[in-house]
């Protein structure tokens, strides 16, 4: 259950972080309206707060979160940007997720 809760929290955190970075990219690269910077800043503040909700040490949290972030970023690439994923994208995300699971499932006494 803890793994499921952490995975859901990591996924929400990743989406919020990506939104916070994607909106300024739209402003800079695609000349979208400047007001998009306000929800971007709010999104990044929410991202920082969400990271504090994770129960393990900060460094371990960030390391495990990285695996989820990679998978969510590739999902964003596919669903939002409309880019087809390659087998290399899928393989890389799989390796990252395995790494996340190794970190998250380590024994408490390790």
From Swiss-Prot:
Membrane topology summary: Multi-pass membrane protein
Entry superkingdom: Bacteria
Keywords from the named record: Cell inner membrane, Cell membrane, Membrane, Transmembrane, Transmembrane helix
GO cellular component: plasma membrane
Transmembrane portions of the chain: 8-28, 33-53, 63-83, 90-110
Subcellular location: Cell inner membrane
Name the record gives this protein: UPF0060 membrane protein Veis_0342
Protein species of origin: Verminephrobacter eiseniae (strain EF01-2)
């Amino acid at each position: 259950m803890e793994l499921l809760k952490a995975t859901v929290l990591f996924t929400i955190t990743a989406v919020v972080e990506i939104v916070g970075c994607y909106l300024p990219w739209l402003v800079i690269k695609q000349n979208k309206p400047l007001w998009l910077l306000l929800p971007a800043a709010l999104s990044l503040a929410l991202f920082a707060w969400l990271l504090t909700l994770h129960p393990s040490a900060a460094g371990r949290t960030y390391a495990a979160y990285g695996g989820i972030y990679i998978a969510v970023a590739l999902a964003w690439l596919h669903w939002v940007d409309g880019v087809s994923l390659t087998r290399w994208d899928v393989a890389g995300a799989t390796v990252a997720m395995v790494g996340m699971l190794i970190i998250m499932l380590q024994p408490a006494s390790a």
